Structures are given as C-alpha cells and as structure tokens.
Regions:
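Short, flexible loop motifs at catalytic/binding sites
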Residues: 1-209
Length: 209
C-alpha cells in the first residue's frame, strides 16, 4: 500500500498502479504542480494493467466544478432503495419526503412514501434496510457508481439531520450560506449551487410540516 498526496506530481508519476483508490477528489488541486490534473495523472499509471481497478470517493462540493459529480454522471448512478413500511414500494430516502414539526421535534421525524403518501417513522424505515438494494438510473454504463445520503445511515438519526438543517437555515436567513453549504454537501451528499442560481426558491430551504 502506497499513500500519495494529490499535490505531488513526482510521486504520482513514479510507479505503476494496479488498484487505485482516490479519496476526497473534490478537494484535489486543479493541477499537481505544473503536471496537470492529479486524478488523470494517477489513472495514467494504470495503463499497463488489463485488470486494473479504480475507486473514486468524495463528498461533493460546488455544482459545475465538482469532480465527483462529473465522475458519477458517467456511471450507473445507483441509489440505495428500501421498501415503504406501509405499501412495499421501493424508493430512496429523500430529504424532500422528510416530514417534521420545526416547533416541536419531539413529535418525531417521518418519511413520506413517494407512492402511497403515508408517513412512517425513522425506526420503521430503517427496519427495512435488510431488504434494501441499489437501483441504477443508468444500468448500461461501464462503471458502477453509488450515492448515499445520511438519511440511509445507521449511525446518524434523522432528528440530528433536521437539527443541523434548522441551524443552517437560520444562518442562511441571516445571509451566511456556509453552514447550509456544508449541510447540503455532507448530509445530503449533493453539490451546492451558489446563491442566485436557485437555492432561495427550492423546497430544500422551505421545508415545513
């Protein structure tokens, strides 16, 4: 195992690589010194292996300049789907379907089924994880790609996600978008669109019960 920094052109060009793991690629510099794109430099080192493997992982950043967004669009674009506890319809857990009372979070956070429209608790949805599977939007692609948000995580509760959202929304209303940017990138696993493009009018920042 060899660990190399994305800003080190000499290291990137110094050895053949059969299995390449690129982590947090959205934070790579645009160029490794004067040598060019570090991701392309690293992939160039795999050309001698017919059975090479490449894994590219990242939290997304800014829409239009995100490396992982660009890479993901060229893949199978698979989303984790679980069945509705009420009707059995398979679907990804989406923020647009999260329901809560912002004035009384003790009432719990629920997810509304995209087909039957009925609401179920976090516990009910996560109990369905054992039946879950990935569904591809672009199954004919040569490379597989996967997207997960925090709603599907067994390590973080939905109430915590909502609390972070409400804090970020409060700061956004005061003119500071940084916490909301971080929330969108890290909790939803989505790219952030800069102010003036669409954010103020989306359901994202206007979630209500």
């Amino acid at each position: 195992v060899t660990i190399i920094g994305a800003n080190s052109p000499a290291s990137l060009a110094s050895r053949p690589i059969k299995v390449l793991l690129c982590d947090e690629v959205d934070r790579y510099p645009a160029s490794a010194g004067t040598e060019g794109d570090p991701l392309l430099l690293a992939q160039k080192r795999q050309t001698t292996f017919w059975d090479k493997k490449t894994v590219i992982v990242s939290t997304p950043t800014i829409k239009g300049s995100s490396r992982i967004e660009t890479e993901f669009q060229e893949t199978t674009r698979e989303e984790w789907n679980v069945p509705c506890p009420k009707c059995g319809h398979y679907q990804p857990l989406r923020w647009a379907n999260i329901v809560f009372d912002r004035h009384d979070l003790k009432k719990g956070v629920r997810h509304k089924c995209e087909r039957c429209g009925r609401e179920s608790s976090e516990y009910a949805w996560k109990a369905q994880e054992i039946k879950g599977h990935f569904v591809a939007a672009n199954p004919g692609a040569a490379a597989r790609g996967f997207h997960l948000n925090t709603l599907a995580s067994t390590f973080c509760g939905w109430q915590e996600v909502v609390e972070k959202f409400l804090l970020a929304k409060e700061m956004l209303d005061q003119g500071d978008p940084e916490k909301m940017k971080t929330w969108v990138n890290t909790e939803l696993g989505e790219t952030w669109e800069e102010p003036g493009e669409r954010l103020e009018d989306t359901e994202l920042v206007n979630r209500r019960e």
